């Protein structure tokens, strides 16, 4: 993996070494799966569900994102969505919604780094 791309992914919160271990050391496989992340609609679904008060839809989308970020080793997003899901399940919807500005910033940073993969 190009050192500049690796540095960008790392700066965006991707634990590249952990992800490569998960993908059996295959940079090509990791790259292929990372490139699918920006196309996933779960973040848009989460945002829309929170705005509409659709609690079930929001929990499902946040839980999906938590899993995706765990599998791809996007650590800040995994931690954020893990916390958000816990808040949602505790019926603390105001706190869960209040996390969206930081989650959006972290999400956009990760997507930007992933798009640099080409």
Where are these regions (language model features)?
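Two-component system phosphorelay core
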Residues: 1-118
């Amino acid at each position: 993996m190009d050192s500049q791309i690796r540095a960008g992914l790392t700066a965006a919160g991707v634990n590249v070494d952990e992800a490569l271990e998960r993908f059996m050391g295959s940079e090509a496989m990791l790259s292929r799966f990372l490139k699918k992340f920006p196309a996933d609609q779960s973040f848009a679904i989460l945002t829309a569900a929170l705005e509409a008060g659709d609690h079930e839809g929001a929990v499902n989308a946040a839980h999906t994102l938590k899993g995706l970020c765990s599998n791809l080793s996007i650590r800040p997003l995994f931690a954020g969505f893990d916390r958000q899901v816990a808040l949602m399940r505790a019926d603390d919807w105001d706190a869960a919604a209040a996390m969206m500005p930081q989650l959006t910033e972290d999400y956009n940073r990760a997507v930007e780094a992933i798009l640099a993969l080409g």
